């Protein structure tokens, strides 16, 4: 997703770099208590409709930056600058959620065809002061004002809010073989590849700008880093910036170790401890028969480990190949929970071909709760990065299915049509990991005929959920102005069709947005 210029989020990139980001989505409409059973959800922009960063080729083609108009003071080691980001996004949706609302909540007056406009502005100011021995005292203050004009996909009308985004002070050493970086206050933090810790802020609903999702910073953050040329050790305490209407009062702490080679290959391990949470979990009914059970405060006490790695080659026999891998394991003895999730990805860039096409295959799997065991196996995706090339599973479907009880095969073909124009085609085959187990939060609990009579079930009776296609176009006008447009469709699979009386329609949509970024 598009981010502001440095000082940026603390993203675990090249050690020694100077420091400068989940969707709370539910199958609308549904029982509010069940909708909250995600345990907090993910709060980024949705995987389609949000602004995209330019590709490296596009960025290289942009005109030189020239005079830095954002720096307004630079004297005696003190440098101060302003930041500004803004965007407008026009969205159209047809047959939202495959028209499920007309079947399971016919009295809710939910419109499955919507058009809306959304926008945001994100101004900020930052400084850094170079002191003796190379130490740098730095800080940043920014805010987000967001709004939706009309009714969005989750039936929220004219939502708007102005909130603090970042507001931190920090101290960094830079002249030693091993350096320290300490900061306190709201700011962005992404660990690993963004599988569990990436987006600390929630947009949409009463705050507006559902698709853009401009909020990324954690509401409270204390972050310390020790790094040398290749290795980085991070310790953190964070609280997400949650919606007032769905505040799980989450607090997390942990560590991250990352080792990176000169070739930018890396491997790392993140540990997460949920110190406090009111966010509930959901458990499948025994043998999948009956309504799911809510576990109040289920996330409280969760332990999670995330191993991640990435390798790419620019020369030799394996040049132009990319391989990444992520594996997460979660446990919570208090509620007898044990879950896992992971991703394997391989890609190749045809560097000598016209348009330099790159083809990437991704396999993802996130455990679902097995209704035949007493243990809770439902994976908690926490605060993942929800952009198309990160952890969104599908395009349309990711507005319904968060990364739990899912498995998916994904293909992406990206082409650099001109130095300023990029085109990406994405396809996703999405299936349920466990049958008779909640796919999302428990909506569509329904009676079905069984040999023993009618029983209630949640989830699906067939694995295949949907096939998603998404075509995205990105144009860079200059280093500050970007345009993104896309069209997408989700074709219901056997699992969705079996839960829908009659013929389930194809869910389609389109968007176009413009973003200004300084």
Q: Each predicted region: which residue ranges?
A:
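Sec-dependent N-terminal signal peptides
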Residues: 1-3
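Beta-barrel outer-membrane channel/assembly domains of diderm bacteria
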Residues: 19, 24-25, 29-185, 222-226, ...
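Outer-membrane beta-barrel translocator domains and adjoining extracellular loop/strand segments
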Residues: 94-103, 150-156, 194-201, 239-254, ...
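Outer membrane beta-barrel
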Residues: 118-242, 250-254, 258-262, 266, ...
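Transmembrane beta-strand segments that form the barrel wall of outer-membrane beta-barrel proteins
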Residues: 205-209, 232-241, 269-273, 321-331, ...
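Outer membrane beta-barrel transmembrane domains
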Residues: 254-311, 437-472, 484
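Long, internal scaffold/assembly segments composed of regular secondary structure
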Residues: 277-368
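Flexible glycine-rich, low-complexity coil/linker segments exposed to the extracellular/periplasmic environment
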Residues: 373-405
């Amino acid at each position: 997703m598009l981010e502001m210029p440095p000082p940026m989020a603390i993203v675990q990139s090249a050690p020694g770099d100077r420091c400068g980001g989940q969707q709370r989505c539910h199958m609308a409409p549904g029982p509010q208590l069940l909708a909250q059973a995600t345990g907090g959800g993910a709060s980024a922009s949705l995987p389609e409709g949000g602004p995209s960063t330019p590709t490296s080729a596009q960025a290289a083609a942009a005109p030189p930056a020239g005079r830095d108009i954002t720096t307004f003071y630079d004297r005696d080691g003190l440098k101060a600058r302003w930041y500004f980001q803004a965007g407008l996004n026009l969205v159209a949706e047809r047959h939202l959620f495959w028209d499920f609302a007309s079947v399971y909540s016919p009295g809710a007056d939910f419109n499955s065809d919507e058009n809306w406009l959304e926008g945001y502005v994100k101004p900020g100011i930052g400084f850094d002061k170079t002191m003796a021995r190379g130490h740098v005292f730095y800080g940043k203050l920014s805010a987000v004002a967001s709004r939706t004009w009309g009714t969005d996909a989750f039936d929220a009308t004219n939502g708007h809010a102005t909130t603090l985004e970042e507001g931190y002070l920090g101290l960094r050493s830079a002249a030693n073989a091993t350096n320290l970086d300490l900061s306190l206050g709201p700011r962005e933090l992404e660990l690993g590849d963004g599988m569990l810790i990436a987006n600390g802020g929630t947009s949409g609903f009463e705050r507006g700008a559902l698709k853009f999702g401009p909020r990324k910073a954690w509401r409270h953050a204390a972050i310390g880093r020790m790094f040398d040329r290749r290795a980085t050790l991070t310790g953190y305490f964070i609280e997400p910036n949650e919606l007032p209407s769905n505040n799980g009062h989450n607090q997390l702490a942990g560590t991250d170790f990352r080792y990176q080679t000169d070739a930018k290959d890396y491997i790392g391990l993140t540990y997460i401890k949920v110190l406090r949470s009111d966010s509930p979990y959901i458990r499948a009914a025994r043998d999948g028969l009956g309504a799911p059970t809510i576990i109040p405060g289920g996330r409280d006490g969760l332990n999670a480990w995330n191993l991640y790695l990435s390798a790419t080659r620019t020369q030799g026999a394996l040049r132009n190949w990319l391989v990444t891998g992520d594996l997460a394991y979660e446990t919570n003895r208090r509620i007898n929970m044990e879950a896992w999730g992971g991703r394997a990805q391989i890609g190749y860039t045809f560097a000598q071909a016209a348009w330099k096409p790159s083809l990437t295959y991704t396999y993802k799997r996130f455990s679902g709760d097995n209704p035949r065991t007493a243990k809770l196996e439902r994976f908690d995706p926490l605060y993942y990065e929800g952009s198309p090339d990160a952890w969104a599973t599908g395009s349309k479907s990711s507005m319904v299915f968060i990364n739990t009880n899912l498995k998916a095969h994904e293909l992406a073909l990206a082409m650099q049509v001109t130095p300023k124009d990029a085109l990406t085609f994405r396809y996703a085959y999405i299936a349920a990991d466990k049958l008779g187990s909640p796919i999302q939060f428990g909506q569509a609990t329904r009676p079905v005929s069984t040999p023993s009579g009618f029983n209630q079930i949640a989830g699906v009776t067939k694995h295949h959920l949907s096939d998603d296609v998404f075509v995205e176009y990105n144009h860079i006008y200059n280093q500050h102005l970007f345009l993104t447009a896309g069209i997408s469709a989700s074709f219901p699979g056997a699992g969705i069709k079996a839960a829908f009386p009659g013929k389930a329609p194809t869910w389609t949509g389109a968007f176009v947005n413009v973003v200004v970024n300084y």
